[in-house]
Amino acid sequence: MVGQLSEGAIAAIMQKGDTNIKPILQVINIRPITTGNSPPRYRLLMSDGLNTLSSFMLATQLNPLVEEEQLSSNCVCQIHRFIVNTLKDGRRVVILMELEVLKSAEAVGVKIGNPVPYNEGLGQPQVAPPAPAASPAASSRPQPQNGSSGMGSTVSKAYGASKTFGKAAGPSLSHTSGGTQSKVVPIASLTPYQSKWTICARVTNKSQIRTWSNSRGEGKLFSLELVDESGEIRATAFNEQVDKFFPLIEVNKVYYFSKGTLKIANKQFTAVKNDYEMTFNNETSVMPCEDDHHLPTVQFDFTGIDDLENKSKDSLVDIIGICKSYEDATKITVRSNNREVAKRNIYLMDTSGKVVTATLWGEDADKFDGSRQPVLAIKGARVSDFGGRSLSVLSSSTIIANPDIPEAYKLRGWFDAEGQALDGVSISDLKSGGVGGSNTNWKTLYEVKSENLGQGDKPDYFSSVATVVYLRKENCMYQACPTQDCNKKVIDQQNGLYRCEKCDTEFPNFKYRMILSVNIADFQENQWVTCFQESAEAILGQNAAYLGELKDKNEQAFEEVFQNANFRSFIFRVRVKVETYNDESRIKATVMDVKPVDYREYGRRLVMSIRRSALM
């Protein structure tokens, strides 16, 4: 049975660092290594039939092989791709990047042969491997011959004589800006205890420059996410390094990075799977790398939408889903700094049929185009528990539309075949329902009352197609503070000035604001709702400033605006919550959004509902 293994492969790897071979080895033992909050790492003791070596490390993307028990003690596997890292003390670690289990542990049953431990420190002579075939590296896996299992006579073709390291292989030499040479090491091998190192990595994400100012001073920073074949790491530059490196570094380009400061990663602010993170310092060097074809792009560790309900609040996740629908971008004012930013909600669905609301901010919100229902892969979205489970896409998150990965093709195929006909079930509303258009949790007004929505500790949200049957125009408008961020009612001083108690200021003018009570109805029930500025303007088809002018100058025209709004139908997004006033509890319904009815989408949804009812 020894002939099944690539005898001498361990010596070839450890003495010459040969990464062009594809040896067949047996797993003797697997030991997990504690890595804090990061994915577990596994250390393997492997045999080539002559020697054993415990310096094999499994790349994290191969962890499922261990967790699903495909890779276990006594199994035989072929290593298709690996890298060799040399530690400070001269010892070598072999990181397994790609392998194939040729024979399960159950099929093999025992340790093959009588291998002895390889002693790297004694300079053990290399066992000469069999002569290589003409093109040993061209085959991606051993081909069975004469009904064999892919081992035996093909083993000698799995690897050849040792060669010098290739650019995609283990430690190589890179010239830094200082003219010296340093070894290129994998990201997975970086620790704070190393002083001289160089990595070759692809930039998969680059943040905008952010500034801060506090009692200790002010400054600026930007961050990067870097990836190579072994793993990923986050890097941050501050102040002078921002000026130096921000204009030079481009997303998706590959660079040599040297001499950064390594420290324990703050997992609160990054979804990057690494225990450490890098900070640029005065000695940091960044040099372009032209040979970039071998490096991967963004690494994802996807969480299914139906699994988000098990994730804790504020945790960071990678998610992939079809953009089922999306809302228009709106502007909101951030209270902490009075800065106006764009906000847009999008609705993502995966093969589970579950839908989650993800919120885009700033430039991501402004530039988003979901018209073709793209597949979106998002790395590092923050989980929120607002109304169930929802996601917030941070400035540090990475968004890729229609990524070239198997998960995206699988999702697109499913959606085109059957998913697009589903409403989906939202996990972003406490009482979730279907999804269609840009709203979730469809309810008739009768269902809202019969299901006691709004009676719990938290408010409930629903969407309904309803018709305006009455508008209470009395006291629907008030004179408000003219400043942008204040809507407080002003007091007419009767001297041409209007006083805002909140701002403690008098103004020569004011702005009109609306609070409109509307009775809406569908085929079963009716409901009084309160509409504030934007939703009231959408129903009436006029802005508050124009309506205020009509009210003062042309009462008849003002009346006609309200009459014309009667018996118009809309999609209402409503918040309901029980409120108590003077010991009397009642349901308060507030309109959060008003949109025109897309009758094609509405009809499709009704047809699907009828079909589901027919199957019950």
Curated annotation (Swiss-Prot):
Residues 121-154 are annotated as: Disordered. It is linked to Pulmonary fibrosis, and/or bone marrow failure syndrome, telomere-related, 6: An autosomal dominant disease associated with shortened telomeres. Pulmonary fibrosis is the most common manifestation. Other manifestations include aplastic anemia due to bone marrow failure, hepatic fibrosis, and increased cancer risk, particularly myelodysplastic syndrome and acute myeloid leukemia. Phenotype, age at onset, and severity are determined by telomere length. There is a cross-link at residues 22, 88, 163, 167, 183, 220, 244, 259, 267, 331, 410, 431, 458, 553 (Glycyl lysine isopeptide (Lys-Gly) (interchain with G-Cter in ubiquitin)). Its main location: nucleus. This is Replication protein A 70 kDa DNA-binding subunit. A zinc finger (C4-type) spans 481-503. Residues 197-281 bind DNA. One of its GO terms (biological process) is protein localization to site of double-strand break. It comes from Homo sapiens (Human).
